[in-house]
Amino acid sequence: MTTIADLFTKYNCTNCQDDIQGIRVHCAECENFDLCLQCFAAGAEIGAHQNNHSYQFMDTGTSILSVFRGKGAWTAREEIRLLDAIEQYGFGNWEDISKHIETKSAEDAKEEYVNKFVNGTIGRATWTPAQSQRPRLIDHTGDDDAGPLGTNALSTLPPLEINSDEAMQLGYMPNRDSFEREYDPTAEQLISNISLSSEDTEVDVMLKLAHVDIYTRRLRERARRKRMVRDYQLVSNFFRNRNYAQQQGLTKEQREFRDRFRVYAQFYTCNEYERLLGSLEREKELRIRQSELYRYRYNGLTKIAECTHFEQHAATATHRSTGPYGHGKTDHTHTSNGSHRPPSSSLHSPQPNLRKVEMSSGGEASSNSIAPRNTLHIADPTCSGALLPSKNYLDSCRGSSAATMLQTTGMVMGVTVDSGATTGVTSTATTMANLPTNSAKGSQQHLQPLQQHPQLLQSGNQHKMQNEAAGGGSDQVPSMSLKLRTQLEELKHLPQPPGSELLSHNELDLCKKHNITPTTYLSVKTVCLSGAPSLGSPMETSLRKFFIKCGWLSH
């Protein structure tokens, strides 16, 4: 049987010593005795060889009947050389394969391999079982384009919208989709001199793998930047000066917002980035609109048609408060002569005769007011801290003589000597007067004589109780010293603490009970009411717990 080694072995005729090409005649009785067909036909006999010895025809690989039958069949030697050349030079490199075979052209080599080893019997017996053993991947994404594997997400990026001159200036090659000078051009230097060797230690191998990993990361960054350039069309925007900061139809606030948010564009595609900006701008518009609607509802408006008249009214009354969510500051307080308060006055500034004017008007609201009756307007939370009392001002009120005076006034008011004195003290609580900032010393001077005669107050109170029990509400007034009467008269003219004219009777009683100044109470009330109108917020929960703990709320 002929082996692969025999295919490339040269044989010579023992009789004529010529090279045997093709079939030779081998003597079965003599050792290493081969004859060519010409010498065998002539009946040559040499040495011990006789022409009547047994013989057999041997094929050296050049016979046309060796592998494939038919017209134009290749010899076994040529088939072996074809397979070796394809393994060495690769499928498709038919020019080099033809040179390796030496007897066939490139077209013949391609046709022979495709017909015999791909589409022929060998190909059907070899490739078909291999294809059937491959795992089958099932597409579970469906027909819709939603999700990360949808058609929209996997679609190719749009081409750069530039002409040939602009591409030449940038060094951009459209067919290759790359630039002559790429981003981070020195990245290839990390692995340009790397080569694996059998003498490398484990540390050397790990170091080379680390270099490859760094190079891969830099390639990813290069690809990411190229994707952003293509997705956002930065090249065309550069030449046409159509960046986002100069887009037509954008306000100054929108341009500033887009400039601040531009750093996040690297995490989104162009369409996602535009949708995100549009959503954020829409959210801001809805918040502003919600604040406007809250302001309208705060002022008692329930129909959109009423808002136009309300805005016209708020524009004319520039110093009136239209609610905690509005912009038109108004003031429902007037002086006794009907003039408006100066614009420079704050919420906590003293306001003379506020409740007298309200009572004299018969409880009617001001003609310029749209808010409901008996509605206390607070400062606009959208404004700066100008409407809130300063820290030094609040600290001066806390623990001041005015606060002590308010408590002592309440104690003295409880010592009612007669009905006239009771009426006078009560009218002092209802009638609000101006409180100068330097009233602390005067209040101390008025209260000092009272503190020196506590027994007089106690004895007068006991004497009045005895007379009421005995006389049943007689009009006789017990005798008192002239000094005590003078002090009680002076109590009627004591000024109230700042901010008292803005509080109701219940709120004043609450301030007295918990020993806090009206300005402090107004500040706390302003902070509580000017927050976002949302229920269940952490701020609301904290304040509610604090109020319940202090006893301001029952539940």
Swiss-Prot record:
Occurrences of domain SANT (ranges): 69-121
Subcellular location, principal: nucleus
GO biological process, one term: chromatin remodeling
Entry binding sites for Zn(2+) 2: C27, C30, H49, H53
PROSITE patterns: SANT, ZF_ZZ_1, ZF_ZZ_2
Binding site for Zn(2+) 1: C13, C16, C36, C39
Quaternary structure and partners: Component of histone acetyltransferase complexes containing Gcn5 and Ada3.
Protein name per its UniProtKB record: Transcriptional adapter 2b
Organism: Drosophila melanogaster
Species classification: Eukaryota, Metazoa, Ecdysozoa, Arthropoda, Hexapoda
